[in-house]
């Protein structure tokens, strides 16, 4: 029963990731209709791209963690909850960014818009760093458990070695 609930939660988490990605794309497309100062702001583009990086950490690494025998189903559920929380926060940042790209927000000055963009950029950068840290710590837990069993090569084969992107 517990594994069925965990599997259900994981599917919901993945669906949430897809939803957030689609929101980000919609907001980015809406930038085409906004003042040149904001539309050309590199930070807006980077903020949206960072969501893709966060989603990539989740999708690529959590899929590997699901096949890792060093994690229990309860631990995988907790890890999925951690990623979900980060993705929800990233979705909130995109909602804040929506204020900038929303044409009906005519009362905002360019400075107000740039302040919102800057705040969103900083928060998304923090969330991206948090996601990398969270992923690396979970992989290191698996590695330490594998080390106790003299099975580190399997973990390296699964996640890659230290020279690779995620850890």
Predicted regions located by residue number:
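Extended amphipathic alpha-helical interaction segments
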Residues: 51-123, 127-133
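Extracellular, luminal, or virion-exposed ectodomains of exported proteins
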Residues: 34, 39, 43-47, 63, ...
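Long amphipathic alpha-helices with heptad-repeat character
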Residues: 17, 21, 48-51, 124, ...
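Primarily heptad-repeat coiled-coil rod domains in cytosolic scaffolding/tethering proteins
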Residues: 5, 39-42, 46, 74, ...
């Amino acid at each position: 029963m517990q594994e069925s609930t965990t599997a259900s939660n994981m599917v919901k988490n993945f669906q949430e990731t897809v939803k957030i990605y689609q929101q980000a794309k919609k907001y980015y497309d809406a930038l085409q209709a906004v003042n040149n100062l904001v539309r050309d702001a590199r930070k807006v583009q980077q903020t949206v791209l960072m969501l893709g990086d966060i989603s990539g950490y989740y999708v690529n690494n959590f899929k590997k963690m699901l096949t890792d025998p060093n994690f229990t189903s309860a631990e995988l559920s907790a890890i999925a909850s951690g990623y979900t929380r980060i993705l929800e926060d990233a979705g909130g940042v995109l909602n804040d960014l929506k204020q900038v790209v929303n044409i009906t927000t005519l009362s905002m000055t360019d400075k107000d818009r740039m302040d919102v963009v800057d705040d969103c950029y900083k928060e998304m950068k923090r969330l991206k760093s948090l996601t990398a840290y969270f992923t690396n710590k979970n992989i290191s837990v698996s590695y330490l458990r594998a080390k106790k069993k003299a099975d580190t090569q399997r973990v390296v084969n699964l996640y890659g070695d230290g020279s690779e992107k995620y850890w």
